[in-house]
């Protein structure tokens, strides 16, 4: 709701510029993590004896990646918008969050130990505190740039508190060590995921950047209003999957049948949870936009009705991404994501000039569907996953599996 209030306060054009700056920064965010998150969690679960070396080396890599990413962000924004001083300032401030990525080793540790509650506490706590601060900024009539500073401060506070929680509930920082050899091993496994993560961010955020460059900041503001409602649900699959991933990995080591049963249950849950969200939002989109954002954002209604269905593919995609990690098929994940990103960019070039924001939303749906489901059919290694996802659409079979699961408990 704070994001909605900020949008109403700033208006479509200024909110569009802020959204453009955030999307631009996120476009480079994947570079700063170097594709390490899933690899590190996997190694912490499978190789607990090397945890000190894994965590210490990861922290060093994230620090280096953050610095290099920030430099890349600055160079690119000066090239893309050479005459837009405010955009350059906003991106410079928001991009500074990349410098605090090393604290994310705490997130990886908590996830590997199935105690992600600490991460949730910190993230929710910092969000609530800075939500209050942003309310004060609105009430005091502060300019656009103040919200960028607040976002940076929120990232810094979250990083500091996460580090403290890690010190209290994880290995002692003094025990961590950095190894060049271990860094090479991590990067060897993570580079496909790095490229895949970059491609993911491209096909998730490039629409806002292309709208800003091809149509204008006001169009980005209208589009971002719809996307904000559509994407507000994306924390759900991430939280659920992060909690069950270690259990799925353990099932893989003991029984392949149980492993795929757990995976099927996860697909079922992700699909119908997303449909349960998308259906009411589709029919209530105009009322939702009018109530939340006001009349000035009413053009976002048809965009929301389309874009909300991306959640179906996002929910399934988050679940299946863990399967690629467990099966060490990062290359396949990378290949399909690259294809999705290219399709998204190409379709945006075709659709945005004619259909503007509605075209961008439609392009998002098409590219997500190709990456998450359709591409599974065309590769032998992933065909089983394709049929598992398709089977999740059969509500009768889902209900039957739920009954069997309930009776076994």
Predicted segment positions?
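Hydrophobic alpha-helical transmembrane segments
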Residues: 91-95, 121-168, 339-343, 357-380
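Membrane-interface junctions at transmembrane-helix termini in multi-pass inner-membrane proteins
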Residues: 43-46, 99-123, 145, 308-336
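Transmembrane helical elements of multi-pass membrane transporters/channels
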Residues: 126, 147-162, 166, 179-249, ...
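Interhelical loop/hinge segments that connect adjacent transmembrane helices in multipass membrane
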Residues: 117, 144-148, 162-204, 247-261, ...
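Helix-loop junctions and terminal segments of transmembrane helices
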Residues: 3, 32-49, 112, 170-171, ...
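Membrane-water interface segments that mark the loop-to-transmembrane alpha-helix transition
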Residues: 1, 21, 26-77, 89-90, ...
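Interfacial segments at transmembrane-helix termini and the short loops linking adjacent helices
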Residues: 12, 77-94, 217, 257, ...
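Signature of the first transmembrane helix
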Residues: 1-37, 126-131, 151, 155, ...
């Amino acid at each position: 709701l704070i994001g909605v209030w900020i949008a109403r306060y700033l208006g479509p054009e200024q909110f569009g510029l802020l959204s453009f700056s955030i999307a631009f920064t996120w476009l480079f965010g994947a570079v700063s993590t170097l594709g390490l998150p899933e690899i590190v969690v996997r190694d912490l679960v499978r190789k607990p004896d090397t945890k000190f070396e894994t965590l210490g080396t990861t922290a060093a890599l994230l620090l280096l990646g953050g610095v290099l990413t920030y430099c890349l962000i600055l160079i690119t924004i000066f090239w893309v918008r050479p005459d837009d001083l405010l955009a350059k300032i906003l991106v410079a401030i928001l991009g500074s969050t990349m410098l605090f990525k090393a604290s994310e080793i705490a997130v990886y540790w908590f996830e590997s130990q199935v105690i992600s509650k600490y991460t949730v506490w910190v993230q929710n706590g910092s969000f609530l505190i800075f939500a209050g601060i942003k309310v004060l900024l609105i009430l005091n009539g502060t300019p656009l740039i103040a919200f960028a500073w607040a976002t940076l401060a929120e990232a810094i506070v979250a990083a500091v508190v996460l580090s403290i929680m890690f010190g209290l509930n994880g290995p002692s920082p003094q025990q961590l060590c950095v190894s060049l050899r271990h860094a090479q091993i991590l990067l060897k496994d993570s580079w496909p995921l790095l490229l895949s993560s970059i491609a993911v961010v491209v096909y998730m955020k490039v629409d806002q950047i292309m709208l800003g460059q091809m149509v204008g900041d006001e169009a980005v503001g209208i589009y971002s209003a719809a996307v904000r409602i559509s994407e507000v649900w994306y924390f759900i699959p991430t939280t659920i999957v992060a909690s069950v991933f270690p259990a799925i990995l353990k099932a893989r080591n003991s029984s392949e049948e149980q492993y795929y049963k757990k995976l099927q249950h996860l697909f079922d849950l992700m699909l119908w949870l997303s449909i349960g969200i998308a259906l009411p939002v589709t029919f209530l989109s105009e009322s939702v936009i009018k109530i939340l954002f006001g009349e000035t954002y009413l053009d976002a209604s048809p965009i929301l009705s389309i874009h909300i269905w991306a959640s179906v593919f996002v929910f399934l995609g988050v679940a299946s991404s863990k399967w690629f990690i467990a099966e060490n098929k990062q290359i396949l994940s990378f290949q399909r994501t690259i294809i999705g990103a290219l399709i998204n960019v190409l379709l945006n070039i075709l659709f945005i000039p004619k259909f503007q924001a509605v075209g961008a939303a439609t392009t998002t749906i098409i590219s997500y569907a190709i990456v998450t489901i359709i591409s599974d059919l065309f590769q032998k290694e992933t065909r089983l996953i394709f049929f598992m996802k398709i089977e999740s659409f059969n509500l009768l079979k889902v209900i039957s599996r739920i009954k069997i699961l309930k009776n076994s408990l």
